[in-house]
């Protein structure tokens, strides 16, 4: 019998790749749901070593990071840009209709 797959752990492995992380965040942005984007960003940060490591790198208190990325969180744009930068993701505006990679790769 095949062991059950821990989907969260598999997602975190995939999100360690900056291109996959960017595609994941783009998909969340395109969905137009702020909560979905914050959850996606939280998952990308988890793939980068977790909130303690991110807190050390950003000098933002770990508890504050959890609050700003919670379902009721409201991080400022400056903090979002900082968290993206720490994750190796560059934020830019592109014209509507431009194709972007929005799928995670399928791994076997």
Predicted regions and their residues:
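N-terminal flexible/basic segments that precede or flank functional cores
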Residues: 1-43, 100-107
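Short basic helix-loop element that most often maps to the first helix and adjoining turn
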Residues: 38-56
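Residue at a beta-strand N-cap/secondary-structure junction
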Residues: 48, 74-77
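Residue-level "edge-of-site" marker
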Residues: 68, 96-97
């Amino acid at each position: 019998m095949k062991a059950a797959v821990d989907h969260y752990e598999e997602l975190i492995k995939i999100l360690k790749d900056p291109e996959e992380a960017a595609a994941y965040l783009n998909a969340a942005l395109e969905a137009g749901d702020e909560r979905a984007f914050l959850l996606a960003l939280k998952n990308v940060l988890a793939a980068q070593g977790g909130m303690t490591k991110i807190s050390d790198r950003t000098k933002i208190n770990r508890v504050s990071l959890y609050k700003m990325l919670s379902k009721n969180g409201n991080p400022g744009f400056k903090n979002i840009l900082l968290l993206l930068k720490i994750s190796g993701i560059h934020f830019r505006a592109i014209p509507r209709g431009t194709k972007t990679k929005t799928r995670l790769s399928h791994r076997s």
